[in-house]
Regions:
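Single-stranded RNA-binding regions, centering on S1/OB-family and related RNA-binding modules
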Residues: 1-257
Length: 257
C-alpha cells in the first residue's frame, strides 16, 4: 500500500480512473464486510466496493468459502478498478475486483515461476504444520514447518508472525499448487558456523532434549549438541560454551553453562 504508484492512484478520482484504464493492480485496506459479504475498501480519495463474487477466484463456483472474504477486514487487499458508480447517498464509489487482480497475477507472474525462484511473500496465517504465505494478490502457498529452518521448531510462530514480509524459495509446483521453502536463504552450515569460534560462550535456544543430549540452536540454520543439564526444556534460552566445531562432520559440540 505504501508504494509510490499506489499512493499516486489514491490521490484523486481521475488518478483512480487512470489506474482503471491501465489495469493497474492496487492495494487498499478493507474496512467493512457487509451482510452480503461485499468488501468496502479505503481507496484514499473515495471508498471502493468489492462485490462478493469478485472477492476471490473460486467464489462463484463455491471452491472458496466466504470466510476468505470476511477475514480480509482490516487487512490489505489487492484489486483492479473496474468502474465507478453512485451509491444510495449520491457519492461516487469505485467498483473493484480482487478476483480479476488474482487472475492477472496468475497469468503474468505466478505462471512464470519455477522451482528455485526467490519470491517475496507475506505470512497470512500459521498452523502447526507450517505457515501460509501470500505470494501475490491473495494467492496463498504453503511453507511447511520443516522447510522454515534447519534447526527444528515446534510451531511456525517461533519464526514468523501474521503480516510479516519474508522472502522464500519456490520449492515445488504440483498441479498449480506451490510449496515454499525458507531455510535455503538462511545460509549454509559453513556460513553459519563461521560466525562462531571454539572457546566462545554464546546465547542459544534449547530446541529438543533427547536421551543422548540437548540440541541447542545457535542460529536458525545451525544447532549444536550439548550434554543434558538438569532443569532444561525445549524453548528455554541458554548460555552455551562452544567446545568444538568440526566442519568435516558438520557438528558443533556445546556445554550448557
Amino acid at each position: 500500500m505504501e508504494t509510490p504508484e499506489n499512493r499516486a492512484a489514491f490521490q484523486s478520482a481521475s488518478s483512480l480512473a487512470d489506474a482503471c484504464r491501465d489495469r493497474q493492480i492496487l492495494e487498499g485496506r478493507a474496512v467493512i464486510c457487509d451482510s452480503s459479504h461485499n468488501l468496502v475498501v479505503d481507496c484514499g480519495c473515495m471508498r471502493g466496493l468489492i462485490p462478493r463474487e469478485e472477492g476471490a477466484i473460486g467464489m462463484n463456483d463455491g471452491s472458496v468459502r466466504d470466510i476468505a472474504v470476511i477475514s480480509r477486514v482490516n487487512r490489505p487487499v489487492c484489486f483492479l478498478v473496474t468502474g465507478f458508480q453512485k451509491n444510495e447517498d449520491g457519492k461516487t464509489i469505485a467498483l473493484l475486483s480482487r478476483r480479476a487482480a488474482q487472475e492477472l497475477c496468475m497469468k503474468e507472474y505466478v505462471s512464470t515461476l519455477v522451482p528455485g525462484d526467490i519470491v517475496n511473500a507475506r505470512i497470512t496465517h500459521l498452523e502447526t504444520f507450517g505457515a501460509f504465505a501470500d505470494i501475490g494478490c491473495g494467492i496463498v502457498s504453503l511453507l511447511p514447518i520443516d522447510m522454515i529452518s534447519v534447526s527444528r521448531i515446534d510451531h511456525p510462530r517461533e519464526r514468523f508472525s501474521v503480516g510479516m514480509d519474508i522472502t522464500a524459495v519456490i520449492k515445488a509446483i504440483d498441479n498449480g499448487r506451490i510449496s515454499l521453502s525458507h531455510k535455503e536463504l538462511l545460509g549454509t552450515w559453513e556460513e553459519n558456523a563461521a560466525l562462531f569460534s571454539p572457546g566462545e560462550t554464546v546465547a542459544g535456544i534449547i530446541r529438543s532434549v533427547e536421551s543422548y543430549g540437548a540440541f541447542v540452536e545457535l542460529t536458525p540454520n545451525l544447532a549444536g549438541l550439548a550434554e543434558i543439564k538438569e532443569g532444561i526444556s525445549p524453548g528455554q534460552q541458554a548460555s552455551v560454551y562452544i567446545k568444538s566445531i568440526i566442519p568435516s562432520k558438520m557438528k558443533v559440540k556445546l556445554i550448557i553453562v
